[in-house]
Amino acid sequence: MKTTHKRALAAFLVLTVPVFAGTVQAWGDIGHRIVAELAWRQLDPSAKAEVERLLKADGSDSLADVASWPDHLRNDPDQKELGKATAKLHYMDFVDGKCVYVKPVDCKDDECVVGGLEKYVAILGDRHKSNAERAEALKFVVHFVGDVHQPLHAGNRDDKGGNDYQVQFDGKGSNLHKVWDSSMLYTRDLPWPAYTDRLAAEGPVALPKPIPPLDNPYAQWAEESCSIVAANGFYPDNHKVDDAYVAKYLPVAETRLRLAGKRLADLLNHTLD
């Protein structure tokens, strides 16, 4: 992707789509599918046609079907090395704990979800790349947009994105990351297509205002996630995720899913135009 196009993309996303260590998943399969399907429904015809073409070249059926693909690479003997090489691109840790993105410390050598998005959006938008390269980039972009909107994939604590924070949920032992990945979403007792319909029926999501002085939309999305994690009450003091916690934070999780879907659609519309 040319430098001028990268700058234009950054400006576009900032104006129209404001912006844990270890091998962990974000949202789980249900959340990633919801984000992908919400985005699919908001694609322009030209972008949708290009997505379909790339998916067909990849042998895939739908955007939702490939949304969790990066999480399964390390379990695939043929893709294990790619999974290992991209493992750090699923998340980031705010080192100073203040949720202020400082690239040299928060994304050293571009090995964080912000760097992952920058890398694969550039490949996706490069028409000189092969269909295989661009299809692979598409799958990473879909997944990483979902990842960066899961609050615990851009946290400010040294607890492996909540994996080390043990909680009781529904009478069973768990951890806070798993609760946010999927456990809270499952309390709706809806399959992902019906869940997507429910969220889509809420209408257009209100986009947060840009956070100055950032000119990197992906970093802004990470800062938003971090601010949720840093708020009082996000980590339950008694290590118990009760009905009151779910009532408070399930709408927050659903808003993040809706934002991710909208932003992914706008990103693909712009990149594939």
What do the predicted segments below correspond to?
Residues 25-144, 151-273:
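N-terminal, motif-rich segments that launch catalysis or mediate targeting to/interaction with membranes
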Residues 2-3, 18-26:
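Low-complexity, Gly/Pro
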Residues 10-20:
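Bacterial N-terminal signal peptides
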